[in-house]
UniProtKB/Swiss-Prot annotation:
<comment type="function">
    <text>The beta subunit is responsible for the synthesis of L-tryptophan from indole and L-serine.</text>
</comment>
<dbReference type="Pfam" id="PF00291">
    <property type="entry name" value="PALP"/>
</dbReference>
<dbReference type="InterPro" id="IPR006654">
    <property type="entry name" value="Trp_synth_beta"/>
</dbReference>
<keyword id="KW-0028">Amino-acid biosynthesis</keyword>
<dbReference type="InterPro" id="IPR036052">
    <property type="entry name" value="TrpB-like_PALP_sf"/>
</dbReference>
<dbReference type="InterPro" id="IPR001926">
    <property type="entry name" value="TrpB-like_PALP"/>
</dbReference>
<dbReference type="InterPro" id="IPR023026">
    <property type="entry name" value="Trp_synth_beta/beta-like"/>
</dbReference>
<dbReference type="GO" id="GO:0005737">
    <property type="term" value="C:cytoplasm"/>
</dbReference>
<comment type="similarity">
    <text>Belongs to the TrpB family.</text>
</comment>
<keyword id="KW-0663">Pyridoxal phosphate</keyword>
<dbReference type="GO" id="GO:0004834">
    <property type="term" value="F:tryptophan synthase activity"/>
</dbReference>
<dbReference type="InterPro" id="IPR006653">
    <property type="entry name" value="Trp_synth_b_CS"/>
</dbReference>
<feature type="modified residue" description="N6-(pyridoxal phosphate)lysine">
    <location>
        <position position="88"/>
    </location>
</feature>
<keyword id="KW-0456">Lyase</keyword>
<comment type="pathway">
    <text>Amino-acid biosynthesis; L-tryptophan biosynthesis; L-tryptophan from chorismate: step 5/5.</text>
</comment>
<keyword id="KW-0057">Aromatic amino acid biosynthesis</keyword>
<keyword id="KW-0822">Tryptophan biosynthesis</keyword>
């Protein structure tokens, strides 16, 4: 792999572990990406779509009520306000422009919560590209509003009935399709994971989240935050937030994995802290696997965090100690979901609720501490209201 244009590794993590047939395809993608990054016309078109179609820059909102009685200032980076309802739209626009540049005529994608699927469907509709989205059958059931949105915008949604019927199985099916149709098809991967160059492409097409946050917080507070906090599944919203702060050594980078029903139960999605390094989904990264190397089922109340591995740059940031990775249970995320809705009038995605829950935990631990925190509110919670309603009804909490 010494003949790649960009470094395919982050420390020991990353790489390009794919069938031989896909290696030239990935190298073609890398070449097109490097050229596009240096092409002012491509950059201008991408910037125009982000501004006039997606609605960037997104707001940085101060929480007025959640921190009452404490000395914390808590800001939310409002990716939930982006067209499509989540941060996913950013990099989808970039990748489809890249696919068109490469002469591809068809887009495929995988989706968990459905947010990446919706972003892919809306961008394909606008940029006139046929689109197929693979989605675990379990996720099709629990994210029905997003399935309807995708189909409404012309996408073909394929429920995947294999394995755990969740995101990892959708990823495998998308890979199979791509292997068979790579000449005409671009696989629009939804997170900062997978084989090189996807982790780098996705980070570069998401890093405006952190760049905008830095500008906005300096404008509002005259200083950088003490910590930026983001949920981590595959890791795209978090790396988008972290990228511009990595060199700011005084800013803590905190990634929040799903602890599900509790780490001790084994029903979680926290491979960074509770997995082991292995090869999965075309990359070397921490994964949830048994002693024989078989991939274990991940679990989270949040479909978008229900993934047994994590992007290689997060693995590297964890290893070198630049970022901290913690975990939050379903119950803690549910509480944060309700708190934000009740006190700030914002309904967050269950994914983002994990990051918010950790911020609230930090504040509660030391209410007298003067601190400036930013949570990446990666998506809105419309898609989750039926899931939450059902859980609260079952618990008799309504």
């Amino acid at each position: 792999m010494s003949d790649t244009l960009l470094n395919p590794y982050f420390g020991e993590f990353g790489g390009m572990y794919v069938p031989e047939i896909l290696v030239p395809v990935l190298k073609q993608l890398e070449q097109a990406f490097v050229e596009a990054q240096n092409d002012p016309t491509f950059q201008a078109e991408f910037a125009d779509l982000l501004k006039n179609y997606a609605g960037r820059p997104t707001a940085l909102t101060l929480c007025r009520n959640l921190t009452k009685g404490t000395k914390t200032k808590l800001y939310l980076k409002r990716e939930d306000l982006l067209h499509g309802g989540a941060h996913k739209t950013n990099q989808v626009l970039g990748q489809i422009l890249l696919a068109k540049r490469m002469g591809k005529t068809r887009i495929i994608a995988e989706t968990g919560a459905g947010q990446h699927g919706v972003a892919t469907a809306l961008a394909c509709a606008m940029l006139d590209m046929p689109c197929r989205v693979y989605m675990g059958a379990k996720d099709v059931e629990r994210q029905s509003p997003n399935v309807f949105r995708m189909r409404l915008m012309g996408a073909e949604v394929i429920p995947v009935q294999k394995g755990s019927c969740s995101l990892k199985d959708a990823c495998c099916e998308a890979m199979r399709d791509w292997s068979a149709n790579y000449e005409t098809t671009h696989y629009l991967l939804g997170t900062a994971a997978g084989p090189h160059p996807f982790p780098t492409i996705v980070r570069e097409f998401q890093k405006m989240i952190g760049e905008e946050t830095k500008r906005q917080i300096l404008e509002r507070e005259g200083r950088l935050p003490d910590a930026v906090i983001a949920a981590v599944g595959g890791g795209s919203n978090a790396i988008g937030m972290f990228a511009d702060f990595i060199d700011e050594s005084n800013v803590r980078l905190i990634g929040v994995e799903p602890a599900g029903k509790g780490i001790e139960t084994g029903e979680h999605g926290a491979p960074l802290k509770h997995g082991t390094t292995g090869i999965y989904f075309g990359m070397k990264s921490p994964i949830m696997q048994d002693k024989d190397g078989q991939i274990e089922e991940s679990y989270s109340i949040s479909a978008g965090l229900d993934f047994p591995s994590v992007g290689p740059q997060h693995a590297y940031l964890n290893e070198i100690g630049r970022a901290e990775y913690v975990s939050i249970t379903d119950e803690e995320a549910l509480n944060a979901f309700q708190e934000l809705a009740k006190h700030e009038g914002i309904i967050p995605a269950l994914e983002s609720s994990h990051a918010l829950a950790y911020a609230l935990k930090l504040i509660k631990q030391n209410p007298e501490k003067e601190q400036l925190l930013v949570v990446n509110l990666s998506g809105r919670g419309d898609k989750d209201i039926f899931t939450v309603d059902k859980i609260l009804t079952e618990k008799g909490m309504k």
